[in-house]
A protein has these predicted regions:
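Short S/T/G/P-rich N-terminal loop/turn motif that feeds into the first structured element of a domain
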Residues: 1-60, 68-74, 98-112
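Charged, amphipathic alpha-helical segments and their flanking helix caps
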Residues: 17, 84-86
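Conserved, mostly hydrophobic/aromatic
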Residues: 64
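Short amphipathic alpha-helices in soluble, non-transmembrane regions
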Residues: 75-84
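Conserved short beta-strand edge segments in small beta-sheet-based binding/regulatory domains
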Residues: 86-99
Length: 112
């Protein structure tokens, strides 16, 4: 059963204060670290700017959507993100879930 992660993030003042050369070096490290993720079955479904024109839009500037074969694979990615120092530079929230269908989701909502 696939598992999913949605990230929402915005560069913070610490990131904005870095010279471009340091930002580039940091992002090169991220690129290198991400190169082996596909071998673990980790898929990037989307990385990009958020669309502020949608109803109830998030104030976050960027989003990432990921699919994982197991929760353990998801946790490997999250541990790598944390270890990289990413959270020092970006205001960031994560939302994770496994696969679910409409009927089970509606039943869960009804019980809340």
């Amino acid at each position: 059963m696939p598992h999913y992660l949605v990230e929402l993030y915005t560069p913070n003042a610490t990131w904005q204060a870095l010279p471009e050369s340091q930002r580039t070096t940091f992002l090169a490290g991220i690129r290198t670290a991400m190169s082996g993720l596909a071998q673990m079955g980790i898929e990037v479904l989307a990385l990009g700017d958020t669309d502020y024109s949608v109803d109830q839009a998030s104030a976050h500037r960027f989003l990432g959507i990921w699919r994982f074969p197991t929760p353990q694979a998801r946790d490997i990615l999250l541990a790598g993100i944390k270890a990289s120092g990413w959270y020092d530079y970006f205001d960031h929230v994560n939302a994770a879930s496994n696969t679910g269908g409409l009927e089970s989701h509606l039943a869960t909502l009804a019980r809340q």
